[in-house]
Design a protein with these regions (language model features):
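Catalytic cores of nucleotide-sugar-dependent glycosyltransferases that transfer UDP/GDP/TDP-activated
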Residues: 1-165
Length: 165
């Protein structure tokens, strides 16, 4: 089975991850890396692939500009290029939604073999997963990671309220 874990926000890379380097580089990255590492060790999984957004920002590390980063023999981080190579925080990702969706569909179209299932993390990735299902019939599942539940009452901060919405 070929499984894609789709997560667009934060600085997702092989270890060592610099947690906290951006406001979006936190616990969900640990979850995704752990999930996919465990799946890659299974005999019935041929490829555990993390798909994220490609960007080029020297302050955040050169790895994020790489198209592919092999973490283990069956664990790959693939970065899709929407044409906007800036790092975008969660609240700014919606401006790149069309571009990253087009890039993801184009990436899938070029493949010899499509993934069997997509696991989308957060609503922005669910948009891409729905597009892949519409185009190719790929089944998908979704994890919201409870940002709003954990942080809604934590602070009276307009930027945080935008992120939660």
């Amino acid at each position: 089975m070929h499984i894609v874990s789709l997560a667009l926000g934060g600085c997702l890379k092989a270890e060592p991850v610099r947690y906290g380097i951006t406001e979006d580089t936190g616990g969900h990255i640990t979850y995704i890396r752990g999930e996919m590492d465990a799946l890659a060790r299974r005999d019935d999984v041929t490829l555990a692939e993390i798909v994220t957004r490609r960007f080029d920002d020297p302050r955040l590390g050169a790895a994020h500009a790489l198209e592919e980063e092999w973490v283990a023999p069956k664990l790959l981080i693939r970065r899709i290029d929407s044409g906007d190579r800036r790092y975008l925080a969660k609240e700014a990702l919606s401006a790149d939604r069309e571009g990253v969706t087009r890039a993801f569909i184009a990436d899938l179209r070029r493949r010899e073999r499509l993934p069997d299932v997509i696991h989308a993390h957060f609503a922005d990735a669910a948009v891409l997963a729905r597009a892949a299902q519409a185009e190719f019939g790929i089944e998908w599942t979704y994890t919201s990671h409870s940002l709003a539940l954990q942080k809604a009452g934590a602070a009276d901060c307009p930027q945080l309220q935008v992120r939660i919405r």
